[in-house]
Amino acid sequence: QTFKQKVPIAGKKVFIKPNIVEFNSNRPIHTNPVVVESMIRLCLEEGAAEIVVGEGSGHRRNMGCLLRECGLEKVLIENKIRFVDINYDQTKRVVNLGAKSKLGFIYFSKEAYESDVLISVPKLKTHHWTNVTLSLKNLFGIASGQAYGWPKNELHFQGIVNSIVDINSTRKADLSLVDGIVGMQGDGPLYGEPINANVLLMSDDPVAIDATCSRFMGFDPAGIEHIRLCSKVGLGNLA
């Protein structure tokens, strides 16, 4: 009941953003398709008018091949869900509400930005630049590939932390579900080792869920700059 009150889905267009950056059968790089399917079914049960899954990898150019390799294509076909390659989706220009970078506007995937309910479904992983990659970092992927190129270098040049804050300030996730069934530790987000974390976490507060996951992973979230700054600008609760 609390979930229904906080994130009403009935009659809404839902955009689900997993983390599908690369595939390696020996490493837990991508969001488990089972977790994505669980979110799809939850949204269907709640009466979503439309469900779209979208991703735009900054590492692999061929999303079709990547979807097949990681097993998500099968889930999408079986559930009759449309997929949007964010790297090629139409662009939506929006005033940058974060203003941490020097960018006056943020260019988003039109489908992601205009969705009624934006759901971030990341993997529980370490990251060599940001310490962790969770719900907040996952929304880096809804920035337009057509506007920023591949792999969205302009956002990197502005500073990853600044860009994460700006993106989330301008279009925050309405709901986050972190796949921590098998997480990644060490040299993430691509080359770390698997760890059986055995957790799934869901929240309508992207800062709180990232802070909780960070503590679970052994980090102090107050020492992770993008989480601390997102809390400071009012995007969620760090405590």
Q: How should each PLM-predicted stretch be described?
A:
Residues Q1-A239:
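N-terminal and secondary-structure boundary signal
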